[in-house]
Design a protein with these regions (language model features):
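Short, structured patches in soluble enzyme cores that scaffold and shape functional sites
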Residues: 75-77, 114-119, 148-151, 177-179, ...
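Classical nucleotidyltransferase
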Residues: 18-20, 26-75, 182-280
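Phosphate/adenylate-binding "loop-and-lid" substructures adjacent to NTP/NAD/dNTP-binding pockets
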Residues: 1-9
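Amphipathic alpha-helical
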Residues: 148-196
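Covalent nucleotidyltransferase
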Residues: 9-141, 279
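N-terminal, charged amphipathic alpha-helical interaction modules
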Residues: 143-146
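Short helix-to-loop capping/linker segments positioned immediately adjacent to catalytic or ligand/cofactor-binding
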Residues: 100-104, 121-123, 148-153, 158-165, ...
Length: 280
């Protein structure tokens, strides 16, 4: 989810303000589309790529879209049990020609976590959109989840809920103001996050040392500003060993990585490879 940091602009807590967990999932918007005389339900990534291995989710939403064909659901493909295995979520949803086995596994492990809805009337405030989701999608679904929201009245209260979200294993928190939906990054969404995400192009790799010989120890990468840095790879040894050759082929691709903060000179503190950004 694209969002500015909480610190980017003061928040007016005298107006309705909400906080929710920030998921480390794959962005997904779901909508109903008219095809001739019938309607079909489709799911897309942030960049418009169609997700083709979540038929179980689309089937479960069919009655909802029959009743509300002109709304769009905004959320993420996620499973909190896989919160430490982002690559698994990606591998399940990115398949363009899923087999029956792929669909079966996805049906067991992939869920849609909805955090907003888009109406034809773009002036609808978040408090009403939140109420709509609670009324129509909160109960009776197996793979559809509505992101939990809490009303907060101060930065101290928001920080408290953020701490709780971290303790529950979420990657951070999102603060929402009571404003209309924006189809772009806006100050209506702010993020509390101890680590940040960024993207950089992989230019080379360095083999691991000691017990990590035969695996990628780190990638060398260059960000959009031309800063070159090392991007360590931390994953299970078995996975790294099995995919040693495959990962060497990632050179030239764009990767997502996490980092704690940036120095005054623009360097990254504690950067870690997260995933290849070719799934959206």
């Amino acid at each position: 989810m694209l969002a500015y940091p909480v610190s980017s602009k003061p928040i007016d807590y005298s107006k309705p303000t909400f906080i929710q967990p920030k998921l480390d999932g794959v962005r997904c918007v779901i909508q109903s589309e008219c095809r001739g005389s019938s309607w079909v339900i489709k799911a897309y990534s942030r960049t418009g790529k169609e997700w083709k291995n979540i038929n179980h989710i689309l089937a479960e939403l069919k009655p909802f879209f029959q009743k509300y064909p002109k709304v769009v659901l905004d959320g993420e493909l996620y499973n909190h049990d896989l919160r430490d295995n982002f690559e698994k979520i990606i591998s399940l949803v990115r398949k363009t020609k899923p087999t029956d086995e792929d669909r079966l596994e996805a049906s067991k492990k992939t869920q849609f976590h909805c955090y907003d809805v888009i109406f034809e009337d773009k002036n609808v405030l978040y408090e009403r959109r939140r109420g709509f989701l609670g009324d129509h999608l909160y109960y009776g679904y197996k793979t559809i989840n509505i992101i939990d929201n809490q009303i907060v009245n101060s930065d101290e209260e928001a920080q408290l809920y953020h701490k709780i979200n971290l303790e529950k294993g979420y990657e951070g928190s999102i603060v929402r103001t009571n404003d209309p939906y924006q189809c772009k990054r806006s100050h209506n969404l702010r993020k509390f996050k101890d680590f940040s995400d960024a993207e950089a192009k992989l230019t080379s790799w360095v083999e691991g040392k000691g017990k990590r010989i035969g695996t990628i120890g780190k990638f060398i990468a260059v960000d959009a500003d031309g800063n070159e840095f090392g991007m360590p790879v931390m994953d299970k040894f078995e996975y790294l060993q099995k995919n040693f050759k495959k990962m060497q082929g990632w050179i030239g691709k764009t990767a997502t990585f996490t980092y704690f903060e940036r120095t005054k000179k623009g360097s990254y503190r504690h950067p870690l490879f997260k995933a290849i950004r070719d799934y959206e």
